[in-house]
Structures are given as structure tokens and as C-alpha cells.
């Protein structure tokens, strides 16, 4: 199957488009890096390019998990970090009965013939920002289609009985391997039957669930931030459609309004 996917050019195209996106992104960044205005709107193309300052934080997870436990929220917010459990033989054996069904993903490897098919490098023309923005948007649409096609193809591979059995299948361009995701666990069963220790030591907040608790006013962002320490600052460069930017702003404002409404209800 993967051999046909390669031969038909689907994977090489995906690989090329990923490289092209990175190169176009870098070209636009270089054009804008010395500008005073760190946010440029391209009205005709309905796109925006901007530099965004982002803090890098270190989180005291054990301290935060203790805090969640004291508030009665720990198993509702946290998942067990399977990677860290794998490194601890005692807890790996202790929690074995609470492990969820194993999930898998596929990984391609390439021989010389496969690498030759994937080696094409994009050449980005030295054009103005407007032209590069158009190239970026064209690439984004093509890349979205290529990614969707590959994700659908991988789902089919995961169901392949031969790959499930052998875990690795060779083909003309290399091989395809089936690998296990880190284990996931039933955190409620662990909390109720084993106790909170494993969740406190190895738990990591599920950000979506944590956001829901913040929105409901059950815990504040200030409480969460108390367990974070900023260790660095970086400047990210982002290119997106104006519609996407507006949706992000709308979602943020909606979330803030929901938090305010919940605070009023509890006042």
C-alpha cells in the first residue's frame, strides 16, 4: 500500500509542500524582520503576518496536582503521563491493570530509492511580500489536502492485519512500521482504587478540561499561573488569514465573557 502511495507521488508531494511552507514562511519573515510595524495586513489577499512575543514557562506539576487534589479536582483535570510511567518500573507494574487499550501510529522509513523520491527542494522566488503571501496561501490549501489524504491513508494502514502481526513491512522504497503510543490510563479508577499518589506524581493537566474548569469559575487563571515560572521569552512569526485571526479573537473574548458570567453567578 505505502509503495503505491510513494509511486503515485502522494508522499513526495506532502514532503515537498511541507518544505515549501517552511521556506516561504522564512522568506516572508526575512522581509519583515527589520520593519517597525510588527503586524502587517494584506487586505487584498485577506491575510496577516505578525511577530508575536511568547513567554516560555516551567510548571511545577506536582505542586499544581497537590493543589488540584486539595480542591477535589485532580482526576477531573489530569491525565497520567504515560511516557514517565514507562520510566518507572514500580508504577508501570502497579498501574498495568488500569491501562487503556493500546493506540498505534505508523512511521515510514526510506532507503536510497525512497530518499531520492523525497529529495526535491523548493526554490522560492525573491519576490515582494504580497506575492509571497499569495504563494503561502496557495501552499496552505494544497498542504491541507495532502495532509488529509495522508492521515486517511495512515488510518487504513493501522487496520492492516499483516502490519499488526509483523509490526514492520518492507517495500521498494524502504519500510513502514507500526509503533505504540505511550500508554494512557483510567485516571478515575486509579484515583479511587490506588489513591492520589500516582496522579500527583505523574499527572499532567489536560488543557481543554482545565480551560473548562476556568470558564466555569471552579479555578482561576491566577491560581493556575501561581505554579508557572517564566524562564524565557521568544518571538514567533505567524502568517494566517484575517478570518482565522478574527476567530481566535472572538473565541478569546467569548471565553472571557463566560468566565465573567460564572463569576457573577457565584458572587
Name these PLM-found stretches.
Residues 1-24, 129-153:
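Amphipathic alpha-helical coiled-coil segments
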Residues 15-123, 144-267:
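Extended, charge-rich alpha-helical segments
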